[in-house]
Amino acid sequence: MTAARNIPTFDDLPLPADTANLRHGANLHDALLALLPLVGVWRGEGEGRGPHGDYRFGQQIVVSHDGGDYLNWEARSWRLDEDGQYEEPGLRETGFWRFVSDPEDDPSESQAIELLLAHSAGYVELFYGRPLTQSSWELVTDALARSRSGVLVGGAKRLYGIIEGGDLAYVEERVDADGGLVPHLSARLSRYAG
């Protein structure tokens, strides 16, 4: 059912269209093969912890490419009420995944994952990490910049993985005021397209 779906495109641009379906469009760049399972449109629900307590949210993540040496990332979420219905817009982020020369110069690994994200809440985050397996990836914040109007946040650690049933699951921990990592977000998303 998801194999025929893709993201909408306009065919009047003189460059390859973005695709979230590996069966359509440009071939995935060879440098991104370790991230291939992420490509697609993912939808589902998760749980978050904020300053006003725990909450549930819905989410869509679009991971697409145009044949370049990076993946496009767009995540949109919305708060859910106690009945699981839409309540209000939630977190939104957009960015790029790519492989780069290892910033740590680790002799056992020559490449690191770089994830650059801009958040609608007014901050930009740079993560570095590695594949843990063929279908799981761990990333940690390396740098964070906040706009004048942006929310104050600490760094984060994210773990993504393709789990039983082919779903995408992730957990994010954020640094709290005491300097420790605490649970912040987790979700399980099913493939909607790709």
Curated annotation (Swiss-Prot):
Annotated positions binding heme b: K157, H184
EC supergroup of this enzyme: isomerase
Cofactors that this protein relies on: heme b
SUPFAM superfamilies attached to this UniProt entry: Lipocalins (SSF50814)
The keyword Metal-binding is annotated on this UniProt entry: yes
CDD domains to which the protein is assigned, alphabetical: lipocalin_heme-bd-THAP4-like
One Gene Ontology term of the molecular function aspect: metal ion binding
Keywords: Heme, Iron, Isomerase, Metal-binding
Domain of life assignment: Bacteria
Catalysed reactions listed for this entry: peroxynitrite = nitrate
UniProt remark on domains: Forms a 10-stranded antiparallel beta-barrel structure able to accommodate a hydrophobic ligand in its interior. In fact, this fold hosts the heme group, which is located in a wide surface cleft.
Function in brief: Heme-binding protein able to scavenge peroxynitrite and to protect free L-tyrosine against peroxynitrite-mediated nitration, by acting as a peroxynitrite isomerase that converts peroxynitrite to nitrate. Therefore, this protein likely plays a role in peroxynitrite sensing and in the detoxification of reactive nitrogen and oxygen species (RNS and ROS, respectively). Is able to bind nitric oxide (NO) in vitro, but may act as a sensor of peroxynitrite levels in vivo.
Assembly notes: Homodimer.
Name of protein: Peroxynitrite isomerase 1
Organism: Mycobacterium ulcerans (strain Agy99)
